[in-house]
Structure formats: structure tokens, C-alpha cells
Amino acid sequence: MKTIIALSYIFCLVFAQNLPGNDKSTATLCLGHHAVPNGTLVKTITNDQIEVTNATELVQSSSTGRICDSPHRILDGKNCTLVDALLGDPHCDGFQNEKWDLFVERSKAFSNCYPYDVPDYASLRSLVASSGTLEFINESFNWTGVTQSGGSYACKRGSDNSFFSRLNWLYESESKYPVLNVTMPNNGNFDKLYIWGVHHPSTDKEQTNLYVRASGRVTVSTKRSQQTIIPNIGSRPWVRGLSSRISIYWTIVKPGDILLINSNGNLIAPRGYFKIRTGKSSIMRSDAPIGTCSSECITPNGSIPNDKPFQNVNKITYGACPKYVKQNTLKLATGMRNVPEKQTRGIFGAIAGFIENGWEGMVDGWYGFRHQNSEGTGQAADLKSTQAAIDQINGKLNRVIEKTNEKFHQIEKEFSEVEGRIQDLEKYVEDTKIDLWSYNAELLVALENQHTIDLTDSEMNKLFEKTRRQLRENAEDMGNGCFKIYHKCDNACIGSIRNGTYDHDVYRDEALNNRFQIKGVELKSGYKDWILWISFAISCFLLCVVLLGFIMWACQKGNIRCNICI
């Protein structure tokens, strides 16, 4: 029995001497890359879901909830629509001569003057909005033979009956309404916008009381255009106590052109003109509050950052905004392929290289070295290969933003009911554009992600090949991203391999001797694992024999009793 115990002990000692890492005349050097416990899934051309160590979201999917007042000049319409402010509704007098980059119309806005309609409302609204100003210049029209500045109880200015401040309601004087024929030249170097209207009485009696004639007519002409409107007399739905209406029209007079107004009744005359400016001002319907902040991009939901190339907040935008796409998320890979580190390394705790898995906890770089030698184990990052990968990835996000950010705004589009088919066509075109952009965005991101992953894999392979060329025949590729170094390689030696100053000639003879020297059981990797497992099994068997022998000896001495009952 003592002989068996002694042999078992000797065998274990010999076996232990041959475990990996105990040979001080060799070392192991592994190359690896950064890994995280939980990576981010991205899409590439070849794979719908591939895990990377880091990724950046490219789609802005939320707003600040408020419209920033900088750097754009925001004009809050409050209770007024832009057209009401243009006409001079009494409760919109505060908007006279105002300027803006973006006019914000609220859902609570209302008209509080004479009931009116604008046959080409959307065009007028868009024209004035893009002009960015309500600057108004009064002109002296000669309205001889009629009474001016008519008012209505439906349009109070304070406690007095009043009317739109930018329009002049003309009606009979001493039961007479002569034919009016007035001209006004444009001697300036800018376009003039004239707003005028036609009154539609609710009854024939109202018509004759105001304009004497049973039917009036209004003709407004320039060298380029002419509009003739015949009033439609008849009752309409009651609004603010009135069943009559005013139709609002507009005429643009170019420099050198002339405005001609001819009427024998029902004319709502202009008091002057608005200056038309060319610019990128706009209008937006929104109930988002206006706050003190800064943002280049504004949507009806509120301002959004424009540091991402895409947004999913709203199709309607103003300013330099990300491109609208349908996707809620598009992630751009800004790190390498993630292969989480295995928590166990087998029975003997060997280190492993990048072919098996990544390394967690590498905070100094993306690529690096781990070693195991006579001085212990260690790890260090390779800053050169890390920087090479980062330099190529860093500008990727900025390049995508430059390709996609719009330097103009997407305005609201309105059409009258008559233009319904045009509206349907326009909507189809817009939807098609969004579909195309959404597809292009997904394709662009997938291509960039594929390039990033290929790039980072390539840097890893470059570092591995660089190390292989340094070590040459002094080491053996273990097939898992590691090298078995066949000479004593302390930490200084390992450092020289990392920084590229390793001289393989210095260690060549020692490495060759160690390669061919037989130490115990030195086997090639094809049979080494088998022998180790067989040796371990024999050791366990011998230990079991020892334990069984002890039990039998104890039974013979009477120290242990064994009763078998049937």
C-alpha cells in the first residue's frame, strides 16, 4: 500500500511539472482585441444582426418639446393666423411691420373681424411666409365720389365698429357710386404685393344700399395679369352676426409695371402695399411652446438637435435638419466585432487569443497583447494599431451627416379642394421620396458598418502578421491567436515584441535547442491533450485504489464495520 501511495505522489509531481506555464524556458504571447460583456447589434450588407463593441444611433427620434428662439428669429402667431395679421384684423394689430424667420401658427388662432375667404389662401400664405415680413407702405389712392373706411359691428377695434386696417371699404356717397378708375405705378426696384377684396352682400337690398347699383364689378390689372370679379349676392351661414362675405384677392406688381383698379361697386380697396422679399423664411403650425435655447432645426413637435444624419420626429422641418426617414433606429458601428470573453479557460487556465474570443477590460486600446512567462502574466494595449482604426472610424459619423443634412426646410403644403388631385399626386411624390431616402439610409449605414467591421478585423490581422514576422522560427503559431515562444522571454523581452524592437537572432540558438530538447513528455499539439487527459485519468484511478485499500485495511483491523442486510 505504501508503495502505491509513493508511486502516485511521484506521478503527480512529474505530471505537474509538465503543466502549461510551468516551463520557465518558454513563454506564451497572445494577441487580442477589445470586447464588452454586452455589445450592440447592427446591420451590415451580409448580416442583419452582428454584434459590435460600440455603435452610435443615427436617427433622432425625439424633440426638446419646445421651439428654440435661437439662432432663428421666431414669431409666435398666438391668437392670429398669418393672413389675419396680413389683413390687419383688430386683434392682430401687434403684428404690424413684424419680421421673422419662422412664423408659428397656433391651433387656437381665430379671426375676429368681417367674415372672409381667400380663394387662393395657401399661395398667399406661402408667399407672405417666405417673404418674412409684414412691412407695409401706405399709398394715397384717389377714391373720389365714394365714402371710405367703412366699418362693421362684427369687427370691433376697442368699442368702435371697425375693419381690417390694411383694407379700405368703399361704399356710396350721397346715394352715388361713380365708376372708379385708379392707377398706381411701381417705380421701385422691388415687387409690391397689393391685397384687395370684393364684398358679397347677403341681399339685393344690402347691395343697393351700399353700392347703389344692383350689381357691381371689380377689375384689377397689371401689364402681366387681369382679374375681374362679379359679386355673388346671397345669404351664407351666419358668422359673427353676418351672412355676407368678403373675398380676398392679391396682385403682385413688378418694378416698372402699373396697377390699374376699375370698379363700379363692391370694391374693398388696398391702402398700400407690402414689400415682397426673397428669402428662406417660412411658416409652421405648432402648439409647442417657444423657449430660450438654441437649435438649427425646428419641427412642429419642437426643436431637435441636428448632430444626427436622420430624424423620425416629423416630416415638416425648418432649418438645417436631419433627413426624415421611416426607421426608428439606425445604428452606425463605431467599434469592432464583439466576441465576449469566455469566463473559463479549461482545467489549466490557459490564456487565449483573438481567434477564440475577445478580451474584456482593455481600457487603453482596442488591440493588445497578453503574455504568460516566468514572471507571471500581463496585458498591454497596442496603441499604434488602435489609433489606425480609430482615425478611420472617427470621421465616419461626420461624413454621413454631411451627406444627409438638409440645408433647406420642408414646408407645409396646402391645396384647395379644387386641387385635390394635385394634392394626392404631391402626397404620393413626397411618400415616394421618403421611401427612397429610408431605403438609401439603411443601405448607407449597412455599407459603412460592413466597412468598419472589415477594417477592424484587418487591423487585428496586420498586428498578428507583424508579430509573426518578428518572432520567425523562435515561436510557434498555436492556432488560437497565440504564439508559443521557445526561449526564456521575460517582461523586457515581451515589451520588445510589442514595440517592434525584438531581435530574433539573439534568441535563435536557445529557441532551436528548446524546440528539439525532450523534457518529460514533450509532444506536438495534436497528441498533447490526449496524453494530459489520460494522465489525469490514471492519477484519479490510482487515488481511488489508495482510498479503496485504506477502507479494506480499516475493515480488517476492525476500525470500520460493514453490514450487508438482505
Curated annotation (Swiss-Prot):
Residues 1-16 form the signal peptide. Pfam families: Hemagglutinin (PF00509). GO terms for molecular function: host cell surface receptor binding. It is found in: Virion membrane; Host apical cell membrane. It comes from the Viruses. Palmitoylated. Residues 552-566 are cytoplasmic. Glycans are attached at residues 38, 54, 79, 138, 142, 181, 301, 499. GO terms for biological process: clathrin-dependent endocytosis of virus by host cell; fusion of virus membrane with host endosome membrane; fusion of virus membrane with host plasma membrane; viral budding from plasma membrane; virion attachment to host cell. Residues 17-530 are extracellular. It is a single-pass type I membrane protein. The record marks 345-346 as: Cleavage. Disulfide bonds join 30-482, 68-293, 80-92, 113-155, 297-321, 489-493. A lipid is attached at residues 555, 562, 565 (S-palmitoyl cysteine). The chain crosses the membrane at residues 531-551. Keywords: Clathrin- and caveolin-independent endocytosis of virus by host, Clathrin-mediated endocytosis of virus by host, Disulfide bond, Fusion of virus membrane with host endosomal membrane, Fusion of virus membrane with host membrane, Glycoprotein, Hemagglutinin, Host cell membrane, Host membrane, Host-virus interaction, Lipoprotein, Membrane, Palmitate, Signal, Transmembrane, Transmembrane helix, Viral attachment to host cell, Viral envelope protein, Viral penetration into host cytoplasm, Virion, Virus endocytosis by host, Virus entry into host cell. GO terms for cellular component: host cell plasma membrane; membrane; viral envelope; virion membrane. Major glycoprotein, comprises over 80% of the envelope proteins present in virus particle. Binds to sialic acid-containing receptors on the cell surface, bringing about the attachment of the virus particle to the cell. This attachment induces virion internalization either through clathrin-dependent endocytosis or through clathrin- and caveolin-independent pathway. Plays a major role in the determination of host range restriction and virulence. Class I viral fusion protein. Responsible for penetration of the virus into the cell cytoplasm by mediating the fusion of the membrane of the endocytosed virus particle with the endosomal membrane. Belongs to the influenza viruses hemagglutinin family. Homotrimer of disulfide-linked HA1-HA2. This is Hemagglutinin. The gene is HA.
